[in-house]
Amino acid sequence: MVYAVVRAGGRQEKVEVGTIVTMDRVKNQQSGKVVLPAVLLVDGDTITTDAAKLADVTVSAEILNDLRGPKIVIQKFKNKTGYKKRQGHRQDLTRVQVTEIN
């Protein structure tokens, strides 16, 4: 069993071949593929965490689609002044599927 922990959009995700990961929006989408940097690699009983060895490891993923996350509401309130502020936010996301771990 081969799996890797990759850095995807500011977070770390445990992935195998075929895993679908939702991460922050990927800007460069012309090719439809993205390479994720590996932080840890497990190949059977062998665990690799050395940065020099992980520089040779590539985790390739195919971009499936772009989407937007759920809306969150931010509210500010100050007592006794009548100050209220309400703001919403939806994060831009990209869904990718891991195609290979080399």
Swiss-Prot record:
Highest taxon of the lineage: Bacteria
GO molecular-function term, one example from the UniProt record: structural constituent of ribosome
Alphabetical keyword list: Ribonucleoprotein, Ribosomal protein, RNA-binding, rRNA-binding
GO cellular component, as recorded: cytoplasm; ribonucleoprotein complex; ribosome
InterPro entries found in the cross-reference section: bL21-like, bL21-like_sf, Ribosomal_bL21, Ribosomal_bL21_CS
One Pfam family, short name: Ribosomal_L21p
Function, in words: This protein binds to 23S rRNA in the presence of protein L20.
Family membership noted in the UniProt record: Belongs to the bacterial ribosomal protein bL21 family.
Name of the molecule in the record: Large ribosomal subunit protein bL21
Organism of origin: Clavibacter michiganensis subsp. michiganensis (strain NCPPB 382)
Gene behind this protein: rplU
